[in-house]
Amino acid sequence: SKIPKQNIHFTHAELGPDRASTHYEDVLKSVGDFDIVLLSIGEDGHTASLFPSHFYDENKSVVVECNSPKYPKNRISMSYSRFNQSRYVFKVISGHTKKDAVDLWLKGGSLPIGKINGNFERVYICKDALPLCI
């Protein structure tokens, strides 16, 4: 089945971080909580443009990242608190280059993916992304 267009909510990064975050904040206010969020993890441990060891204002639904260690430098994302209002959070991780990040996360390391759980969380890790210790 097709997902209706009105149920898909993109950020508009081309507006620049300030205007894009204001626009997305308005979008999020109009749609309420998400039923489903699908996430993965980057080789460096980032998730949804939220990076390890970076501070994000949890009083807002949308956060701006102006010093991303990966291109592009400027990004916007939902805050941890906004993600956690979601009903279901699915974490799907694949790729051998993710092994170190997955290992750190599974050992309790402070990574963004561990801070997003929603009301119900499901985790799927493909064999190629699993560390050898498992």
Regions found by a protein language model. Name each.
Residues 1-134:
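Conserved phosphate- and dinucleotide-binding cores of soluble alpha/beta proteins
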